[in-house]
Amino acid sequence: MKLPIYLDYSATTPVDPRVAQKMSECLLVDGNFGNPASRSHVFGWKAEESVENARRQVADLVNADPREIVWTSGATESDNLAIKGAAHFYASKGKHLITSKIEHKAVLDTMRQLEREGFEVTYLDPTEDGLITPAMIEAALREDTILVSVMHVNNEIGTVNDIAAIGELLRSKGILFHVDAAQSTGKVEIDLQKLKVDMMSFSAHKTYGPKGIGALYVSRKPRVRIEATMHGGGHERGMRSGTLATHQIVGMGEAFRVAKEDMAAENVRIKALSDRFYKQVEHLEELYVNGSLTARVPHNLNLSFNYVEGESLIMALKDLAVSSGSACTSASLEPSYVLRALGRNDELAHSSIRFTFGRFTTEEEIDYAAQKVCEAVTKLRALSPLWDMYKDGVDISKIEWAAH
């Protein structure tokens, strides 16, 4: 077993060797290096063929028409293109948008920008389990609502929203529905022939593909129109100009092909790893699981260890690559806005650690990690006067601290 151990698969995944191999064939002079937009020679034709093959592979994972897949630089760009693109195109119909308080920053900050442009946004509170329900959305709908954006799988707590039910509601009202699915490809079944979803964002690097490439699904039936945010040569049917990065695109296609092939078996394996980890730490007192225990992907275990500071726990776990709730918006030491939205108090939000497991995680790594977590939590609590007070039966929430 090699140290340190990577348990931060929701931040990024390593590229699968099968993906790296395919990518390497699109770079050198004796490889498939041409510009897919070069129509006058075989180098361009070959590159275009590879790009279209990858488009099919991405579409196949989510059961879409390849013509509905638009290449972007990643899920952040896909979210921007979908939300700004649709809001601007349909602004004459209304200027009200709906999203949730626990979306990824790529959605929240895009919404904030649209607010500055004169749109109105309703931000929904999730349930304490971290879910957004169709009833919440229905209650927030207005005559001038044109777009709702709700994520499929949450990046911090791994909860899975019922996008099928939300889609049915919104389609019946004629309101556009965008879903950020960066965290769900290869983990949750997605069938866009059945789902009433108008736009869906994808990322390669959360699914064992390269960074810097993503895609946006834009429905053809019913036809969804969006305004481009990137202008130039008119690539991707005018929705996203810029020379296509063949090696990145081929990598994303292969990653999604592998995901489709391996998903069922991989989910079973990762569920077993996650359960194995939890069984070894659940004896710890004052341990809280953040997010629904049932409506979540097995890859994510977000735990709060009360009376332990998340940052100090991360430092104590120097051989484990994990992230703390407060590090999800990395630069700030604010407690996680996702956990705060679930109603967790600052102390619990600050004591959270996100463990995310993946394709290359082993049982040996899980056992080592669980042992280290138990040791570190026990040691840090032994140093904590608050833990002593809790053990003595003092209700810490009732204490009035003197101001300094």
Swiss-Prot record:
Residues bearing the modification N6-(pyridoxal phosphate)lysine: 206
Catalytic residues of the enzyme: 328
PROSITE patterns per the UniProt record, alphabetical: AA_TRANSFER_CLASS_5
A Gene Ontology term for the protein's cellular component: L-cysteine desulfurase complex
UniProt enzyme class: transferase
Entry's localization field: Cytoplasm
Keyword flag Transmembrane: no
Catalytic activity reported: (sulfur carrier)-H + L-cysteine = (sulfur carrier)-SH + L-alanine
Protein name, entry field: Cysteine desulfurase IscS
Pfam families the record matches: Aminotran_5 (PF00266)
Protein residues bound to pyridoxal 5'-phosphate: 75-76, 155, 183, 203-205, 243
Molecular-function GO terms, alphabetical: 2 iron, 2 sulfur cluster binding; cysteine desulfurase activity; metal ion binding; pyridoxal phosphate binding
UniProt-annotated binding residues for [2Fe-2S] cluster: 328
Organism the protein comes from: Pseudomonas fluorescens (strain Pf0-1)
NCBIfam families referenced in this protein's UniProt entry, alphabetically: IscS, PRK14012.1
